[in-house]
Amino acid sequence: NRPEYFGRMLAEGLLGACIRAENADFSGLSALPKTPETRWTAAKLRCPAFDPAAFRLPAKLCRLIELTAQTWREGRTEAEWKRLIAEHGWETAHLQADLQRTDAVRQIGLRGDCVTLRQLAVTGADFPTLCGKDVGRMLHLLLVYALEHPDQNTKTQLLAAAPSLWQEENKIQD
């Protein structure tokens, strides 16, 4: 349960069935925050062939490790951090930020920036002429808009932007 020992265990041939770690460098894992999420994800990033399920880790942790590895990218801008949160959730973003030793995600949370549908200044009820999936499409368009223009996340400004965003989206769809 301590991935920081992987290097030594691999050298002794103890993990051959679980990890094919050609040239994987597990040094430095012990310097990371002492959470299972952080250390197991760092092991996955250093050895992409690593299968967390082989260690019988909880399914939720395995999914988080895999998602974080799939969406991993260093040097994100603030807008890219917001998109990551919007698309994959706070947990994945916090984990990546911890691994990259940045407080960008924490700052976004502290400011209360709009990164989820729940944080939008409008709701589906503000679009009575739309039905079903069209309501969801509109709200997602407005979320993308709010991610790019955080100062525009007011009911008045989003309702004003909605018709042109909808028209542009439907032009692309046709």
Spans of model-derived segments:
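Internal metal/ion-chelating core segments
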Residues: 1-13
